[in-house]
Swiss-Prot record:
Monomer and homodimer. This is GTP 3',8-cyclase. GO terms for biological process: Mo-molybdopterin cofactor biosynthetic process. GTP binds at residues 38, 89, 120, 181, 283-285. Belongs to the radical SAM superfamily. MoaA family. Its cofactor is [4Fe-4S] cluster. The gene is moaA. The keyword S-adenosyl-L-methionine applies. It catalyses: GTP + AH2 + S-adenosyl-L-methionine = (8S)-3',8-cyclo-7,8-dihydroguanosine 5'-triphosphate + 5'-deoxyadenosine + L-methionine + A + H(+). Keywords: 4Fe-4S, GTP-binding, Iron, Iron-sulfur, Lyase, Metal-binding, Molybdenum cofactor biosynthesis, Nucleotide-binding, S-adenosyl-L-methionine. [4Fe-4S] cluster 2 binds at residues 278, 281, 295. Pfam families: Mob_synth_C, Radical_SAM. SUPFAM superfamilies: Radical SAM enzymes. It comes from Rhodococcus jostii (strain RHA1). Its EC number is 4.1.99.22.
Amino acid sequence: MTAVAMGIPTVRSSVSLAGRPDVDQLVDRFGRVARDLRVSITEKCSLRCTYCMPEEGLPAIPAENLLTANEIVRLVDIAVHRLGVREVRFTGGEPLMRVDLEQMIAGCAERAPGIPLAMTTNAVGLEHRAAGLARAGLTRVNVSLDSVDREHFARLTRRDRLPSVIAGIRAAARAGLAPLKINAVLMPETLSGAADLLEWCLSEGVALRFIEEMPLDADHEWARENMVAADRLLAVLGERFTLTEHGREDPSAPAEEWLVDGGPATVGIIASVTRSFCSDCDRTRLTAEGTVRSCLFSDQEIDLRAALRSGAGDEELAQLWRGAMWNKWAGHGINADGFAPPQRSMGAIGG
């Protein structure tokens, strides 16, 4: 297999603010307000999930192009205090690949007290760091886990690390990183084990959310005719459990919730493709290289790193960020004629 390029989109240093109201928040032309910040801190990962990364991994980002821990802390500070962000989630790649993660979390917790600091992780090695991350100020984690069958897990991730993942999940629970949620990608390869995964999550007392696979794989092999839709999953789970529709926690929450066997336990389904929630999206994304991405599927990014390293003040950086979000698309366009997936894969963008 040949190496897969990072697929860098068009990166701009400025954008038009024409027509934008004079408000501090991250508003866009369709009336949405971004309050949920996703910060990708690395492209590196300890697994090679087939829907996210090629087997050999992604090309390394030159160290000088990565945001430092202090730069990330400053940008999070700006997002919270100038732009109205109310939640921050660290993603990758795999965030645990950064040895300065605890420093980063502690800095953000100090500069933005009271703001939830979350992390999406594969949990490999988390058993050794969960307590320290909690002490630093991390409040909760989501763990990517598609199977609790060791052989199946190894095929999906190309790594035999399931025991480490389970140990990490349990360590996170002991450290009080709650609510602890499991994210599982819906694929033909995972559908047969979906009920077993839900059974395991119920026994561990953790929430489970299934996510429809989106066209964000590094090998660009996603095909609509092969994807597993939410309705198919519901039929499969319904063979073992009684599911009762429970709606969404709030309008901007992506997961539709279903009570399992009358509750109180629930299972969530994020139907990103078949029942998109773009009209309620409240996310803004910062890549590991310091660019703002308004949508997973955007073909443009706005460069904050260059401005930051050139001495730009906080308000100048905030205004660049506002411009990036003002021009956000109405939706991801997956269901539109002529849709073209982004060149960056999920591993390069940050989940």
